[in-house]
């Protein structure tokens, strides 16, 4: 049996901008991508903490250190600049892999600066 498990997430990110004219996606600072172990073109589930909306899109790599979290295309209608969101990736694995899997969690501040990071069930690594 194959299971879909949380692979990684960026928690409490703040939307910095939106571009309705772009073809789609979410642009994320490449430094945050590295820290959260996410990659360009990876499918993400995004949850808007302000309005409860959930939507799927894919990642575009933003400039390193820019702290950009930009929603593009139709996704730009799902959250406004200043909204707090959670960005999640998932992986498919068998039960044996799932037994030892520990998702990566990156928590950011109101300016999208990394505050701390940890694998679920392990201690935080302070980053700021």
Swiss-Prot record:
Q: Which residues form a coiled coil?
A: none
Gene3D superfamilies named among the record's database cross-references: 2.40.40.20
Which cofactor does this sequence's record say it needs?
pyruvate
Query: Record's InterPro entries?
Result: Asp_de-COase-like_dom_sf, Asp_decarbox
Q: Where in the cell is it found?
A: Cytoplasm
What does the entry report about post-translational modification of this chain?
Is synthesized initially as an inactive proenzyme, which is activated by self-cleavage at a specific serine bond to produce a beta-subunit with a hydroxyl group at its C-terminus and an alpha-subunit with a pyruvoyl group at its N-terminus.
Name any Gene Ontology BP term.
alanine biosynthetic process
Q: Which reaction does it catalyse?
A: L-aspartate + H(+) = beta-alanine + CO2
How is its cofactor bound, per UniProt? Binds 1 pyruvoyl group covalently per subunit.
Q: Write the record's keywords in alphabetical order, separated by commas.
A: Autocatalytic cleavage, Cytoplasm, Decarboxylase, Lyase, Pantothenate biosynthesis, Pyruvate, Schiff base, Zymogen
Any GO MF annotation of the entry: aspartate 1-decarboxylase activity
Show the GO cellular component annotation of the record.
cytosol
Q: Which residues form the active site?
A: 25 (schiff-base intermediate with substrate), 58 (proton donor)
| Record pathway | Cofactor biosynthesis; (R)-pantothenate biosynthesis; beta-alanine from L-aspartate: step 1/1
Please give the superkingdom of this protein's source. Bacteria
Q: What is its EC number?
A: 4.1.1.11
Quaternary structure (record): Heterooctamer of four alpha and four beta subunits.
Its function? Catalyzes the pyruvoyl-dependent decarboxylation of aspartate to produce beta-alanine.
What family name appears in the similarity comment? Belongs to the PanD family.
Spell out the NCBIfam families in the cross-references: panD
Under which name does UniProt file this protein?
Aspartate 1-decarboxylase
Question: Which species is this UniProt entry from?
Answer: Chlorobium limicola (strain DSM 245 / NBRC 103803 / 6330)
């Amino acid at each position: 049996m194959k299971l879909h498990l949380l692979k990684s997430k960026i928690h409490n990110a703040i939307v910095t901008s939106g571009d309705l004219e772009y073809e789609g996606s979410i642009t994320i600072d490449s430094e945050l991508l590295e820290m959260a172990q996410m990659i360009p073109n990876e499918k993400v589930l995004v949850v808007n903490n302000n309005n409860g909306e959930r939507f799927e899109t894919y990642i575009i790599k933003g400039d390193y250190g820019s702290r950009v979290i930009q929603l593009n295309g139709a996704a730009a209608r799902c959250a406004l600049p200043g909204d707090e969101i959670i960005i999640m990736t998932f992986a498919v694995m068998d039960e044996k892999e799932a037994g030892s899997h520990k998702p990566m969690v990156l928590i950011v501040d109101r300016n999208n600066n990394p505050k701390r990071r940890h694998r679920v069930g392990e201690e935080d690594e302070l980053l700021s």
